[in-house]
A protein has these predicted regions:
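A conserved beta-strand-loop-helix scaffold within acyl/acetyltransferase catalytic domains
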Residues: 1-48, 90-121, 127-253
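Acyl-donor binding region in acyl/amide transferases
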Residues: 21, 37-117, 234-299
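Short intrinsically disordered coil segments
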Residues: 74-75, 135-143, 311-318
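A general structural signal for short secondary-structure boundary/capping elements
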Residues: 76-79, 133-137, 225, 267-268, ...
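Membrane-proximal basic amphipathic "stem/tether" segments
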Residues: 295-331
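Short C-terminal domain-edge/linker segments immediately following a structured domain
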Residues: 49-50, 59-64, 118-123, 151-156, ...
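Short beta-strand-to-loop capping motifs
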Residues: 61-64, 124-127, 165, 301
Length: 331
């Protein structure tokens, strides 16, 4: 994802790769950029590069080497370089092996690590049986969705089914997705990929690259050749990251996006090598009922950075507290 983004998206020309390696393998990789403001605070720092389509900032860390030593070495080199007083990594997983190794390195060598309050996003852990929908949605709602699928089939004259458009070659599916996304409200708001210079090229290059590696999911809810909704996701190891979704607003009353979400869960369960699905979205989709905690990690690289990290973390906590109070009052 990094190379297509750097070639086609804003800020790519100012992005650097922070990496650690040996003569024969990569140990650590994180795209970064120099920043002069962070979360509204004037502060020079080094930050993970989070473009518009990057939903996880966790660095790549070798699974075959000691991650605590890797983190300690990276922090030590950055401190010696004195390039910035602070490294900020946004959208980092709060748990997991990479975060655990960083906290262990913090405990062992005193990195003075700080963390923002975590936010939750929709996630799915594999179940022994495909009970994802029945665990999170009542039977009456599921029956209503099944009825809508049957109604669509009758109206359109063909069964409504989901097709894996990435299997055996994309065959124009990328352009179909771009057209579908640009046909609705995203065109009106200017946020469709086709409406933003270079963004459609980024999507084409990314999708084709992942497809060539057998790591692209592009499921299409269709009635015959009529596309009702499409969903893309990226395979990474034992996980699946949700990416872009679109639906035909002419059929919104039949909830084609939700019908496709149900089929995505079935597709996920039928892939035994996959252990989890990160939707990379908020927690407002009942079908995806598990949660993943995401936070910003602040790694000081100097005495001034230690002070700045503490103040910035306190500011982020205060903002979250005030936002939570406003949300409770408006509920």
């Amino acid at each position: 994802m990094v190379l297509p983004a750097a070639r086609h998206l804003e800020g790519g020309d100012a992005t650097h790769l922070l990496l650690a390696d040996t003569s024969d393998r990569l140990l650590f990789l994180l795209p970064v950029s120099d920043r002069h403001r962070f979360r509204g605070v004037r502060l020079p720092l080094l930050a993970a590069w989070m473009h518009d389509y990057c939903y996880l900032g966790t660095p790549l860390v070798s699974a075959y080497d000691d991650p605590v030593q890797i983190w300690s070495a990276v922090a030590s080199v950055l401190r010696r370089l004195r390039r910035a007083p602070l490294l900020a990594i946004q959208s980092h997983t709060e748990d997991g092996p990479v975060a655990a190794a960083l906290r262990q390195a913090d405990a062992q060598v005193g990195l003075a690590l700080q963390q923002s309050p975590a936010i939750q996003r929709s996630f799915v852990h594999r179940r022994p049986a495909p009970t994802y929908a029945t665990e999170s949605v009542d039977r009456r709602h599921l029956a209503n969705l099944a009825r809508r699928r049957r109604q669509l089939s009758r109206i359109l004259g063909c069964p409504v089914e989901t097709v894996d458009r990435a299997a055996g070659g994309l065959d124009g599916a990328i352009e179909e997705f771009l057209d579908l996304e640009a046909s609705g409200w995203k065109r009106q708001t200017g946020t469709a990929l086709r409406c933003r210079p270079g963004h459609d090229q980024f999507f084409r290059e990314l999708s084709q690259g992942f497809s060539d590696q057998g790591r692209l999911m592009l499921l299409s809810l269709q009635s015959g050749t009529r596309v009702l909704a499409q969903s893309t996701a990226l395979l990474a190891g034992s996980g699946l990251f949700g990416f872009k979704k679109a639906y035909d607003e002419a059929y919104a009353r039949w909830s084609p996006g939700t019908l496709l979400d149900l089929d995505v869960l079935s597709w996920f369960h039928d892939m035994p090598q996959l252990g989890w699905l990160d939707t990379c979205s908020a927690t407002d989709v009942p079908l995806f009922s598990d949660r993943r905690a995401i936070c910003t990690l602040l790694l000081p690289l100097s005495p001034a950075g230690t002070m700045a990290a503490g103040l910035l973390a306190a500011s982020l906590r205060a903002r979250r507290h005030l936002r939570s109070r406003r949300d409770r009052r408006s509920a």
